[in-house]
Regions:
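Alpha-helical transmembrane-bundle signature of multi-pass membrane transport and export proteins
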Residues: 1-159
Length: 159
């Protein structure tokens, strides 16, 4: 019996989508934080807004997991990616050049809320996309993508 492949079409599509989504969010969130720092000159405001924007992900990820268990995960991920895109377009059109700190904070919190549901949906999808004997490797790939975006996203956002 031949060994199953880790990088099936569906797993590859999900992973590429995750890379694009997570890198985009990490770059954007860090760049917005730097924008706040440039506007205010205050490291305290910079850190406060960045910390506040992480709270929804920390608190609501378990609820995102429940939602991912009860709804079609692929649909959740697609809806959330389009929601992120819509939020970016609205923010850019209305507030990007205004220097409105409340709008920046709200936008960053919205991105964090989306992430609180998106990431559990990705993780819950893995067992349905790969064979059981490849599950550990597939989970490793997903976690590696998360780690790399967390590390490299801010670097790219600072450029």
């Amino acid at each position: 019996m031949p060994a199953s492949r880790l990088f099936t079409r569906d797993f590859t599509l999900m992973t590429v989508g995750q890379i694009i989504s997570l890198f985009g969010n990490a770059i954007l969130r860090f760049a917005l934080s730097l924008h706040v720092l440039a506007l205010t000159g205050s490291a305290a405001v910079f850190g406060g807004i960045l910390a506040l924007s992480m709270v929804p992900t920390a608190l609501l990820s378990p609820l995102g997991g429940i939602l991912a268990d009860r709804m079609p995960r692929a649909r959740i991920m697609v809806i959330l990616d389009f929601s992120t895109c819509a939020c970016i377009l609205v923010f850019d059109a209305l507030f990007a050049r205004s220097g409105n700190l409340a709008a920046v904070t709200l936008f960053m919190v919205l991105l964090s809320l989306i992430q609180a549901v998106y990431q559990p949906s990705v993780q819950a999808s893995v067992p349905t996309l790969v064979a059981e004997e490849r599950l550990t490797a597939a989970n490793g790939v997903v976690l590696q993508v998360q780690a790399l975006t967390g590390l490299l996203g801010p670097v790219l956002g600072g450029i």
